[in-house]
């Protein structure tokens, strides 16, 4: 596990306002610590591992650690990151958030895959206004970021259909049983990664505080129910 050496700043964008950190490998990461809630960290870890297993162009990520010595030296406003293990997403250079005008340049298969994955993990947080997709114009490539809102217990299928940045591509799947079968087979290849990620969660993430006397607000059984939709015939259900 990589140690965080320096906490440089805090991002202004994003609901969780991740910290910008330098790790011992000399690379810069956007880091979500205790401030982001355990559920957010867990969703990032599980969602990221599943996306990676599917071959989606997810930004590289790591488990990073804020050591005791570093933590004690932090100013008060930076201590919100907390001590211990955090989720870190490697900072990406030379890219910007995907703009609506660039959507036609994105391969349709990639659009379908990203939308189908978000539907699978119940992630509504990829919209025109907040795509959570980085775009490199020089080579017309995408980078997928942010799975902290995956496994949403308040997921609204109709909102997803209306607001997802690749909603048009997703509707193609719903209207074509061959595409649905292809997507189901593809999505099932993420199940081993799901189980492995769940089985290898940091033990401290079971607690909402550093004292480890307040259980984290995270329900593994609800996450399992979300994933089981692919086996019980309800994956594409709108109701």
Enumerate the language-model features and the residues they cover.
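Conserved ATP-binding subdomain of kinase catalytic cores across diverse folds
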Residues: 1-100, 120-124, 150
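A short, terminal or domain-edge coil/loop segment
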Residues: 10-14, 110-124, 179-189
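Short, low-complexity, polar/charged sequence segments that are solvent-exposed and flexible
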Residues: 48-53, 79, 105-111, 161-166
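Short, surface-exposed, polar/charged, turn-prone segments marking secondary-structure boundaries
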Residues: 57-61, 69, 115-119, 143, ...
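A general structural signal for short secondary-structure boundary/capping elements
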Residues: 65-67, 130-137, 180-182, 188-194
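Conserved kinase catalytic-core segment
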Residues: 93-156
């Amino acid at each position: 596990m990589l140690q965080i050496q320096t906490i440089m700043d805090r991002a202004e964008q994003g609901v969780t306002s991740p910290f910008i950190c330098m790790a011992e490998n000399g690379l810069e990461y956007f880091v979500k610590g205790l401030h982001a809630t355990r559920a957010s960290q867990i969703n990032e870890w599980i969602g990221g591992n599943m996306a990676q297993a599917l071959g989606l162009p997810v930004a590289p990520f790591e488990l990073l650690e804020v050591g005791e010595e570093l933590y004690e030296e932090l100013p008060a406003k930076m201590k919100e990151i907390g001590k211990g293990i955090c989720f870190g997403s490697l900072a990406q250079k030379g890219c910007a958030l995907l703009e609506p005008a660039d959507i036609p340049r994105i391969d349709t298969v990639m659009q379908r895959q990203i939308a189908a994955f978000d539907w699978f993990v119940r992630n509504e947080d990829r919209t025109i206004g907040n795509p959570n997709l980085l775009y490199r114009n020089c080579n017309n490539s995408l980078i997928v970021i942010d799975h902290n809102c995956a496994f949403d217990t308040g997921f609204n299928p109709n909102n997803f259909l209306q607001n997802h940045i690749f909603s048009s591509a997703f509707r193609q799947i719903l209207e074509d049983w061959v595409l649905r079968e292809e997507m189901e087979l593809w999505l099932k290849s993420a199940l081993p990664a799901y189980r492995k990620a769940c089985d290898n969660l940091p033990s401290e993430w079971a607690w909402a505080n550093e004292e480890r006397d307040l259980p984290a607000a995270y329900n593994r059984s609800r996450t399992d129910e979300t994933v089981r939709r692919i086996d019980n015939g309800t994956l594409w259900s709108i109701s």
